Regions:
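Alpha/beta-hydrolase fold catalytic core
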Residues: 1-32, 53-56, 94-97, 131, ...
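Active-site loop/oxyanion-hole signature of alpha/beta-hydrolase fold enzymes
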Residues: 15, 22, 50, 59-105, ...
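Conserved HGGG/HGGXW glycine-rich cap/lid loop of the alpha/beta-hydrolase fold
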Residues: 22-71, 75, 255
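Short glycine-enriched nucleophile-adjacent loop
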Residues: 107-118, 124
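Conserved loop-alpha-helix segment in the C-terminal half of the alpha/beta-hydrolase fold
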Residues: 227, 231-270
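Catalytic histidine-centered segment of alpha/beta-hydrolase-like enzymes
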Residues: 267-283
Length: 292
């Protein structure tokens, strides 16, 4: 991979939180926003941003609790709050319509935003952003609210008592990242780690994200409501899935039928992080979609 020339950093305020984003320049081009997934950060999009910056004004936020953005007071993180932050950022940028590309949690945020403001989004790419597959949701639905709330309380207390993992070096943290995603190259893992860790007072390194972003809240995921929201999306939508991923196939499980204008790309030899695992394939598919 060629050397990446970095973007500039900026900040904005949402719900009294100071949130960070990077800007890849080319302000006269159409706006395109890349939204990362959970426990990730803005610089995980660097390879994609660098490929798109020639034709687009690429902006990439760190979601609250991630990267160089502030952590939420109380460690409370929900999709509506992330959507609020993206709405605030886009209003600060003040350029519509916008193209959104999101991965996982970021894909869910992009889908929710577009359902609320369909006239503001020109095109949408969601990499495994539809949430848990229906079979997984069915298993969760069997638990009553008090059991889900009890599990949430125990999880919150567990995270409160747990010290975040520390690594003696960046190389050690990068090795952990490779364990998490064996599709990554050593170069990719190191780049993601360099931008994903902060140095602690004792000289060790820790991930920048707030551990509380891992907490699963007890509210049920309402598939009927989600399908109604997806049906509000008016723009062309590209759904991307890795064939080696845990995420369900939205054609096989029927979720794609909720969209007005959507198609699916299943990428071979890719897991959940399709844009890392098969970068060239991802760029080719997204480039063709955006050029239509």
């Amino acid at each position: 991979m060629t050397e990446i020339v970095g973007p500039t950093s900026s900040y904005y305020i949402s719900q009294r939180l100071r949130l960070h984003y990077v800007d890849w320049g080319n302000e006269s081009a159409p706006p395109l926003v890349l939204i990362h997934g959970g426990r990730d950060h803005a610089r995980s999009w660097d390879w994609v941003a660098r490929a798109l910056r020639r034709d687009w004004h690429v902006v990439v936020p760190d979601l609250r609790g991630h990267g160089d953005s502030a952590w939420a007071l109380g460690g409370h993180y929900t999709v509506p709050e992330f959507v609020l932050d993206i709405a605030q950022l886009l209003d600060v940028l003040g350029r519509f319509p916008v193209t959104l590309v999101g991965h996982s949690l970021g894909g869910a945020v992009a889908l929710h935003y577009t359902a609320i403001y369909p006239e503001r989004v020109q095109k949408l790419v969601a990499i495994e952003g539809l949430g848990p597959p229906p079979a997984m949701l069915e298993a969760l639905r069997e638990k009553p609210r008090w059991e889900r709330t009890d599990a949430w309380i125990r999880q919150v207390r567990d995270f409160a008592a747990r010290l975040p993992r520390r690594y003696p070096s960046i190389d050690a943290a990068a090795a952990r990242m490779l364990e998490e995603n064996p599709f990554l190259s050593a170069e990719q893992a190191r780049h993601l780690t360099v931008h994903g860790v902060a140095r602690n007072e004792d000289g060790t390194y820790g991930w920048k994200f707030d551990n509380y972003v891992r907490v699963l809240f007890p509210e049920r995921y309402d598939m009927q409501e989600a399908r109604a929201a997806w049906g509000r999306i008016a723009c062309p939508t590209l759904l991307v899935r890795g064939q080696e991923s845990w995420a369900g196939d939205p054609i096989k499980d029927g979720r794609i039928t909720a969209f007005r204008d959507a198609r699916l790309v299943n990428v071979p030899n890719a897991g959940h992080w399709v844009h890392h695992d098969q970068l060239e394939v991802f760029l080719r598919e997204v480039g063709a979609f955006l050029a239509e």
